From Swiss-Prot:
GN (gene name): aspS
UniProt protein name: Aspartate--tRNA(Asp/Asn) ligase
HAMAP family in UniProt: Asp_tRNA_synth_type1
Domain of life: Bacteria
Chain sites annotated for binding ATP: R220, D221, E222, Q229, E491, G543, L544, D545, R546
Listed GO MF terms: aspartate-tRNA ligase activity; aspartate-tRNA(Asn) ligase activity; ATP binding; nucleic acid binding
EC number(s) stated in the UniProt entry for this protein: 6.1.1.23
Localization in the cell: Cytoplasm
GO CC annotations on file: cytoplasm
Record: residues binding L-aspartate: E174, R220, H457, R498
């Protein structure tokens, strides 16, 4: 008989009366009046093994096994006695009467029980191998596998070719910091780990591969959050001879296919499309969570002439904004709730949080409760009530500051209230999945510190055709042929139509204050390739980690990656990064400089 004939979790009634050989780990061992029960676990689940004292040698071995011992058992599949069926297990109607028990490897006492749901992340990541044995982690990583498989199936059917691109490439520090790799044979020179395969996939389009994809690692040396890792996985795609709408349709269908085949979710038949400017105006975010049924009301123009300087000063500032957020039934929020929200928005740079409770709208000023009403004229109050559509029992929150502060603070407040218990109880958030496309992004952002424009996405994104003339006259007016797929407030994919003409790419570099010499040094290989009849092309990259995190309902992408880093970019399992031998440094022609100590 083979070492293993079945998986533990797949032993069911169809094997009744058969002898099976199983391998796995001891989940639990119970001694019930001379009969030992072992819950044996493998990747497919659990099966109950019964060890009778009739077989003395086997029983003696069973008495010595403990949790997480790796064992092999051979035995007879039989029905469980009446009244002992476990409906929660796939194998819950049967048990295996053990004939032979072999300990393949003993285990020291684990530092935690696998069913402990209150483990710290530090403990989990330090003992990641044991953490990965837990059913939830097994589920998450198998879900990740299925998502990757379904992406490949779809792309294969659509004529895409899986092509690997280099992991050691050229540093082009235009976005996040690169991870640098020193070259031993080229002293003083460095490779960079790719932040994305962007330029290589464009070169593949010039090389006539027409449709490319790969599921690949990317690397960015940036501060980490719950949805970021220094190394992450993209479903990276590029295609030739398709327009922006066709590209979006193609990959919208892919995401719809993946959700249906992996978690049986039917996404919208057609994803809504929203310009960037509308998303910022209504939600203060370029990745709005459409489940939350709250929107901003624009008040900037209405507050320019009020005497209340808190509103009028930002309303008249070039980069200022005044916006309101009406919360239906928010009048029942306590002063403690409001104070808590006030402290919350300070995290995002807001100086405070103005508010008005609408008790009796028909009474005008007298029907309102607020510390700011005394600073506003009746006409201004009427304008606020009319624009927000406020009703009795509502509360209106206000933000007035630089537009970025208003968008960040009021946008965060919108999500916090919407997803709160109050929001759920009052229908301010919907269940389910709310996808959309956000399009027409600004091509450039102005960097005040460097006094120049920088690429909002990357410098290879094509401007909209009607905005080409602005590249040399007014870059700030340029909109890009860029698009992000957003799902429940997460950007799960982003892409664009690329620049395929060398003269346009050179104009973009000039708009970014990248001179001809610098452009040739950094991107000469691309500029040269674009001169050889480069086709119109575009693409998109999806964050595999993010997609699986959402599907699994996980709190962090670290819960869907086998061996992730912490928020300090450390691997607690292997203790990476770590010092290296002086000899290795000499071979790489590197000398370490100690970081400067802060002055006392």
């Amino acid at each position: 008989m083979s070492m293993r004939t079945e998986y533990c979790g797949l032993v069911t009634e169809h094997l009744l009366g058969q002898t099976v050989s199983l391998c796995g780990w001891v989940q639990r061992r119970r001694d019930h009046g001379g009969v030992i029960f072992i819950d044996l676990r493998d990747r497919e689940g659990l099966v109950q093994v019964v060890c009778d004292p009739d077989r003395a040698e086997m029983f003696a071995t069973a008495e010595g096994v403990r949790n997480e011992f790796c064992v092999q058992i051979k035995g007879l599949v039989r029905n469980r006695p009446e009244g002992t069926v476990n409906a929660g297990l796939k194998s819950g109607k049967i048990e295996v009467l053990c004939h032979e028990l072999n300990v393949l490897n003993a285990s020291v006492t684990p530092p935690f029980q696998l069913d402990d749901d209150n483990l710290s992340e530090t403990t989990r990541l330090t003992h990641r191998v044991l953490d990965l044995r837990r059913p939830q982690m097994q589920h998450n990583l198998r879900l990740r596998y299925r998502v990757a498989i379904e992406a490949r199936k779809y792309l294969d059917e659509q004529g895409f070719i899986d092509i690997e691109t280099p992991m050691l490439t050229k540093s082009t520090p235009e976005g996040a910091r690169d991870y640098l790799v020193p070259s031993r044979v080229n002293a003083g020179q460095f490779f960079a780990l790719p932040q994305s395969p962007q330029l290589f996939k464009q070169l593949l389009m010039v090389a006539n591969f027409d449709r490319y994809y790969q599921i690949t690692k990317c690397f960015r040396d940036e501060d980490l959050r719950a949805d970021r890792q220094p190394e992450f996985t993209q479903i990276d795609c590029e295609t030739s001879f398709l327009g922006e709408q066709e590209i979006r349709d193609l990959f919208e269908d892919m995401i719809r296919h993946i959700f249906k085949t992996t978690i049986d979710v039917e996404l919208d038949a057609k994803f809504p499309v929203m310009p960037y400017s509308e998303a910022m105006a209504r939600f203060g975010s370029d990745k709005p969570d459409l489940r939350v049924q709250l929107e901003f009301t624009e008040l900037t123009d209405a507050m320019k002439d009020v005497d209340f300087k808190v509103f009028s000063t930002p309303a008249n500032a070039k980069d200022g904004r005044v916006a309101a957020l009406r919360v239906p039934k928010g009048g029942e929020l306590s002063r403690g709730d409001i104070d808590g929200y006030t402290e919350f928005v300070r995290i995002y740079g807001a100086k405070g949080l103005a508010w008005i409770k609408v008790n009796e709208k028909a009474k005008g000023r007298d029907g309102l409760q607020s510390p700011i009403v005394k600073n506003l004229h009746d006409a201004s109050i009427a304008a606020i009530l009319e624009r927000t559509g406020a009703e009795d029992g509502d509360i209106i929150f206000f933000a007035a500051d630089r537009a970025k502060v208003v968008n960040d603070s009021l946008g965060a407040l919108r999500l916090k209230i919407g997803h709160s218990e109050f929001g759920k109880a009052n229908g301010l958030v919907q269940a389910g999945w709310k996808p959309l496309w956000v399009v027409d992004f600004p091509m450039f952002e102005y960097d005040d510190e460097d006094a120049r424009y920088v690429a909002a996405h990357h410098p290879f994104t094509s401007p909209k055709d009607e905005h080409l003339e602005y590249l040399e006259t007014d870059p700030g007016r340029c909109l890009a042929k860029a698009y992000d797929m957003v799902l429940n407030g997460w950007e799960i994919g982003g892409g664009s139509v690329r620049i395929h003409r060398e003269e346009v790419q050179s104009k973009v570099f000039r708009a970014l204050k990248i001179g001809a010499e610098e452009a040739q040094a950094k991107f000469g290989f691309l500029l040269d390739a674009l001169q050889y009849g480069a086709p119109p092309h575009g693409g998109i990259a999806f964050g595999l980690d993010r997609i699986v995190t959402m599907m699994a309902g996980a709190d962090s992408i670290r819960d869907v990656i086998a061996f992730p880093k912490t928020q300090r970019a450390q691997d607690l399992l292997t203790q990476a990064p770590s010092p290296v031998d002086e000899r290795q440094l000499r071979e790489l022609h590197i000398r370490l400089r100690q970081p400067e100590q802060p002055k006392a």
